[in-house]
């Protein structure tokens, strides 16, 4: 199969490497300088250093060239640039099947990636979302991982899941597109909180409590938006949440740890050098929670630290001072 992967960040590069084992892959980046580096070094020194890029992967910077022979497209651009990329794509080929592999809410509209597709593409478009616990470096290295591919077209989801699985990558299929995307977006917010907790050395008990109560927030918001409860106990819910809140490769957890050390966001983000979606997702998630009247104390605490300049210690104390209710509320 001819597959185009749009976005040459860490995750896009890892997917391209993984998919190239069974398919003809074209990797697209709009950055001409980055393309030249990829071609010269055959590694993504900016985002996935020391990981060889197979010679079979075709590199392009023209979107028209990336889509020319593609039978399937993986869209792996940051959510901030998703709508613009989709608008360019639909003008070139409005019927090419899409797989969204980006996580977050669109800034300003609070739309999920699948909802942005619905606004840009004809209703007939075949679209799926790919998510789950997966650090890019480990996937690129061929270490075992499991993901979920969800689509309203369940036949399409099963077909693509079978096409992209490898000896080390297990891909399940499903139909809860909203639930999968909410889990993938909000886990980054909870991971910032977990990083703050770890940075302050609150210990394992506190981290476990944060993950568990964070999952409750994800589930409440996800169900309010139309997701299924069962999804949040699966790979794209608790699975992705555990990984992002505990793994040392988690950029969002790292942001939290640096905040706990007294660092300012303005200096943290350039140092990390990658898009850290949780920083932007928390604004939209907090706004959604307010509008839908959903209790989201962990999200609120992260929002207050990042955007209301509330000191970390005060935000934590405010959480601890909350009157506990029934666990299942």
Swiss-Prot record:
One Pfam family recorded for the sequence: NAD_Gly3P_dh_C
Nuclease recorded as keyword: no
Family, similarity comment: Belongs to the NAD-dependent glycerol-3-phosphate dehydrogenase family.
Role, per record: Catalyzes the reduction of the glycolytic intermediate dihydroxyacetone phosphate (DHAP) to sn-glycerol 3-phosphate (G3P), the key precursor for phospholipid synthesis.
Enzyme class: oxidoreductase
Binding, NADPH: 11, 30, 103, 136, 251, 275, 277
Gene Ontology MF term list: glycerol-3-phosphate dehydrogenase [NAD(P)+] activity; NAD binding
Known pathway: Membrane lipid metabolism; glycerophospholipid metabolism
Protein name: Glycerol-3-phosphate dehydrogenase [NAD(P)+]
Cited InterPro entries: 6-PGluconate_DH-like_C_sf, 6PGD_dom2, G3P_DH_NAD-dep, G3P_DH_NAD-dep_C, G3P_DH_NAD-dep_N, NAD(P)-bd_dom_sf
Entry EC no(s): 1.1.1.94
The keyword Cytoplasm is annotated on this UniProt entry: yes
Positions that bind sn-glycerol 3-phosphate: 103, 132, 134, 187, 240, 250-252
PROSITE patterns linked: NAD_G3PDH
Localization (cell): Cytoplasm
Keywords: Cytoplasm, Lipid biosynthesis, Lipid metabolism, NAD, NADP, Nucleotide-binding, Oxidoreductase, Phospholipid biosynthesis, Phospholipid metabolism
Active site annotation, chain numbering: 187 (proton acceptor)
Domain of life: Bacteria
Reaction it catalyzes: sn-glycerol 3-phosphate + NAD(+) = dihydroxyacetone phosphate + NADH + H(+); sn-glycerol 3-phosphate + NADP(+) = dihydroxyacetone phosphate + NADPH + H(+)
GO CC annotation terms, alphabetical: cytosol
Gene Ontology process terms (BP): carbohydrate metabolic process; glycerol-3-phosphate biosynthetic process; glycerol-3-phosphate catabolic process; glycerophospholipid metabolic process; phospholipid biosynthetic process
